[in-house]
């Protein structure tokens, strides 16, 4: 993996996760930067890669796809839909259209305060028009999808 990183055509745009630079902190060369490397992020990256490989990439992709489809079906049952066209959707980040007359920010606030569920608002031209629902990594589970759908149903 490091050989692939070392041979890439373009360098990292930031020192924060420049794997070549960070490799120096792990004993592969001289220390280049005078500040402390983001060690906690290195450990988080290591652990996330370990978990992904432990689960198996094919299994991980299948789990994300399955939970995306579960969310899509549950939203349909609530009369809601994803805004991105089929074929342009990400299984991990789902843009849900906010129904007319619904207080987008108010629903997000109630989801957080009453149910402990945080979702994101739309950005740019989608501000106030969509909710961004993440199903990434460990958070991509049937339990989380069902919990979100149940909470959303209670608020609409």
PLM regions and their residue ranges:
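Active-site C-terminal subdomain of aminotransferase-like
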Residues: 1-73, 77
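A short linear hydrophobic-aromatic micro-motif
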Residues: 79-83, 117-122
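Conserved PLP-binding catalytic core of the aspartate aminotransferase-like
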Residues: 81-114
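A common structural junction motif
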Residues: 111-119, 152-156
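Small/polar glycine-rich anion-binding or flexible loop at a beta-alpha turn
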Residues: 68, 87-93, 124-132
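PLP-dependent enzyme catalytic core of the Aspartate aminotransferase-like
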Residues: 125, 129-156
């Amino acid at each position: 993996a490091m050989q692939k990183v070392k041979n890439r055509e373009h360098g990292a745009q930031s020192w924060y996760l420049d794997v070549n630079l960070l490799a120096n902190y792990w004993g592969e060369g001289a220390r280049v930067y005078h500040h402390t490397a983001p060690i906690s992020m290195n450990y988080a990256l290591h652990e996330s890669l370990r978990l992904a490989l432990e689960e198996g990439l094919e299994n991980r992709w299948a789990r994300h796809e399955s939970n995306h489809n579960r969310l899509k079906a549950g939203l349909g049952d609530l009369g809601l839909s994803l805004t991105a066209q089929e074929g342009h959707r990400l299984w991990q980040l789902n843009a849900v259209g906010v129904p007319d007359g619904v207080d987008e920010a108010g629903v997000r606030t109630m989801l957080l305060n009453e149910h402990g569920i945080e979702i994101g608002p739309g950005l740019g031209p989608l501000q106030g028009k969509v909710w961004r629902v993440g199903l990434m990594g460990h958070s991509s589970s049937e339990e989380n999808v069902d919990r979100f759908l149940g909470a959303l149903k209670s608020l609409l």
